[in-house]
UniProtKB/Swiss-Prot annotation:
May consist of two protein domains: the one in the N-terminal side cleaves the alpha-1,4-glucosidic bond in starch, and the other in the C-terminal side catalyzes other activities, including the reconstitution of an alpha-1,4-glucosidic linkage for cyclizing the maltooligosaccharide produced. The lineage of its organism: Bacteria, Bacillati, Bacillota, Bacilli, Bacillales. Its EC number is 2.4.1.19. This is Cyclomaltodextrin glucanotransferase. Its cofactor is Ca(2+). The record marks D362 as: Transition state stabilizer.
């Protein structure tokens, strides 16, 4: 009862403090927020977090004794292809001096922590090293230049004590550069298991790697089953590789990491990744997001399909592209920004789980000499108040510049806490914990022209309204603005840092005002919810018996009922119930997609749709069909007797279109699928051209899946 009263007091205090312009919300997160949905212990949701992406080697050298020696190291960090000395002790030092807490970030996404190759590689006369962490050799050991296992554990413990989560980069797509015909090149892509050699790229008699040449990125299949540049590409249909990565990630989960960023998900089979995610969620579920690089593409159906079916979220490149076009490059306007918000909300089942960003290590930094600081500050404000989980690339708060690799990965230039960008982040980041409209809310455009965008975030009764004028020379007269803000006066949360103003609302109607040139303002209102309202369910996928976390507001302190579709879960199957968070065991129901609801004190919540219940433990099976000739316009698909195979549907839940170019060639087709372990499957292939379906004849094919590992089943078209 004391805890509930304490939370109610904090909620009221925070609301009044924000309206009065108080500095209270800008205390370190760990000092203020106690609700379980906002706590550092909530590994299943990052909705209330702001991520800070740091290249470990480029941030701070906290322990010079672990630096490389010889040609791999440049103490001046003037050669950005070499190691510069940054390590986990450097991160620990900045955690302890409150740099991150004062900035307002509550999660650190660090470079892949695993052991990388020690060899240097000469490309076109330039020495290259594995400073970036993406040239792994042993996924069960640490990169000694970052620190020891004890150092890594200390990093996690120190971060958690400050209310900061740790996200690791993880790259199960490949090891390191290799040449089939030259075992002396680099380390020949060799993979180790805690120091024991598993195998190398040359003479790969066990089939641990693909040997199909380099990808030309001409198709999804080409990118999956051919090498990414010269990197030794894993064959995930190999049972040894499958087990290796399911075991390796558990090692890091057991150390206490809070999240995973998966590299190059576009270049690995969806089926294997879904199976891998299922094993993670059955072990220790954490928020996981992948990198599906889109470049400047507006959208990609395969990208959307992956986000909705793999069990993980994605880095939101559509958001990134739109923000850069509008605020950085001036190639688009606010209507395009609003269109992106609307289209992604339609396409992604869980749009609030996608990770938003304005730049990262694989693209030119947002800031250049030609980009006004105010445009960067506005892009940050938009990202921090928009739907999705915001990620800030290290040095952005210091206006770090750099076009392309390696200049976009320069050494952290300073740790100033007085820049305007730092100030913007520090004022807006805490809103994700204090106002559920920012963490969980919907988005609605309220006023717009080419240069001005006013949008509203709303969750239950909580509201945030954001106004941005990207025109740096002309103010805008805002008239007829209608919002959900209750009657009252509202101060700019930014305190005028970006020339924002205060406003007055009369039943949601805002008095006419002038939005200054280059201005951004944020106004917000929070109040306690009296009815159950779901903001997030995580993970988004699981098997019966797994525990999932439901976050939101207004659940009350007395256990109610959780519904998966029409199946009610009560009693001991609900392992905890608090006003902002519920933990519940997935019931034994038929596999498929379900709407999750909460009933508290006789009142039903909103529905949280598209939660995926799996049949059970998952394995990856490669389905191969021979002699399936098609006509122009036809593609081949697979369906079968379990939800993971589409439950005999020929619609969007069917598997495919199948591939026929790399592992097997037309008229043989194949596809890797995550299916239930130890299960007798019945399945058929079918040809599809638009709405025209051509089924195989004869009886259903049958196959019993293994209890673990991987398998291949090959049939003839009948």
């Amino acid at each position: 009862m004391f805890q509930m009263a304490k939370r109610a007091f904090l909620s009221t205090t925070l609301t009044l403090g924000l309206l009065a312009g108080s500095a209270l919300p800008f205390l370190p997160a760990s000092a203020v927020y106690a609700d379980p949905d906002t706590a550092v212990t909530n590994k299943q949701s990052f909705s209330t977090d702001v991520i800070y992406q740091v290249f470990t080697d480029r941030f701070l050298d906290g322990n010079p004794s672990n630096n490389p020696t010889g040609a791999a190291y440049d103490a001046t960090c003037s050669n950005l292809k070499l190691y510069c000395g940054g390590d986990w002790q450097g991160l620990i030092n900045k955690i302890n001096d409150n740099y991150f807490s004062d900035l307002g970030v509550t999660a650190l996404w660090i470079s892949q922590p695993v052991e990388n190759i020690f060899a240097t590689i000469n490309y076109s006369g330039v020495t290259n090293t594995a400073y970036h962490g993406y040239w792994a050799r042993d996924f069960k050991k640490t990169n000694p230049y970052f620190g020891t296992m004890a150092d890594f554990q200390n990093l996690i413990t120190t971060a958690h004590a400050k209310g900061i989560k740790i996200v690791i980069d993880f790259a199960p797509n490949h090891t390191s550069p290799a040449m089939e015909t030259d075992t002396s090149f680099a380390e020949n892509g060799r993979l180790y298991d805690n120091g024991t050699l598993v195998g190398g790229y040359t003479n790969d008699t066990n089939g641990y790697f693909h040997h199909n040449g380099g990808s030309d990125f001409s198709s999804l299949e080409n990118g999956i089953y051919k090498n990414l540049y010269d990197l030794a590409d894993f064959n995930h249909n190999n049972a040894t590789i499958d087990k290796y990565f399911k075991d390796a990630i558990k090692l890091w989960l057991d150390m206490g990491v809070d999240g995973i960023r998966v590299d190059a998900v576009k270049h690995m089979p969806l089926g294997w990744q879904k199976s891998w995610m299922s094993s993670i969620y059955a072990h220790k579920p954490v928020f996981t997001f992948g990198e599906w690089f889109l470049g400047s593409a507006a959208s990609d159906a395969d990208n959307t399909d992956f986000a909705n079916k793999s069990g993980m979220s994605l880095l939101d490149f559509r958001f990134n592209s739109a923000v850069r076009n509008v605020f950085r490059d001036n190639t688009s306007n606010m209507y395009a920004l609003d269109s992106m918000i609307n289209s992604t909300a339609t396409d992604y089942n869980q749009v609030n789980d996608q990770v938003t960003f304005i730049d990262n290590h694989d693209m030119d930094r947002f800031k250049t000499s030609a980009v006004n600081n105010r445009r960067l500050e506005q892009a940050l404000a938009f990202t921090l108040t928009s739907r999705g989980v915001p990620a800030i690339y290290y040095g952005t708060e210091q206006y770090l510049t750099g076009n392309g690799d390696p200049d976009n990965r320069a050494k952290m230039p300073s740790f100033s806490k007085s820049t305007t960008a730092f100030n913007v982040i520090s004022k807006l980041a805490p809103l994700r914990k204090s106002n559920p409209a920012i963490a969980y809310g919907s988005t609605q455009q309220r006023w717009i022209n080419n240069d001005v965008y006013v949008y509203e975030r709303k969750f239950g009764k909580s509201v945030a309204v954001v106004a941005v004028n990207r025109n740096l020379s002309t103010s805008a007269s805002i008239t007829g603005l209608s919002t959900s803000l209750p009657t009252g006066s509202y101060t700019d949360v930014l305190g005028g840092v970006l020339n924002g103003n205060n406003i007055t609302s009369t039943n949601g109607s805002i008095n006419n005002f002038t939005l200054a040139a280059g201005a951004t303002a944020v106004w917000q209102y929070t109040t306690a919810e009296t009815t159950p309202t779901i903001g997030h369910v995580g993970p988004v996928m699981g098997k019966p018996g797994n525990v999932v976390t439901i976050d939101g507001r207004g659940f009350g302190s007395t256990k109610g009922t959780v519904y998966f579709g029409t199946t009610a879960v009560t009693g001991a199957a609900i392992t905890s119930w608090e006003d902002t968070q519920i933990k519940v065991t997935i019931p034994s129901v038929a596999a498929g997609n379900y709407a999750v609801k909460v009933a508290a004190s006789g009142v039903n919540s909103n529905a949280y749709n598209n939660f995926t219940i799996l049949t059970g433990d998952q394995v990856t099976v490669r389905f191969v069909v021979n002699n399936a000739s098609t006509t122009l316009g036809q593609n081949l698909y697979l369906t079968g007797n379990v939800a993971e195979l589409g439950n005999w549907s020929t619609g969007s839940t069917a598997i495919g279109p199948a591939f026929n170019q790399v592992i097997h060639q037309y008229p043989t087709w194949y596809y890797d699928v995550s299916v239930p372990a130890g299960k007798q499957l019945e399945f058929k292939f079918f040809k599809k051209n638009g709405s025209t379906i051509t089924w195989e004849s004869g009886s259903n094919h049958t196959f019993t899946t293994p209890a673990s590992g991987t398998a291949t089943v090959t049939v003839n078209w009948q």
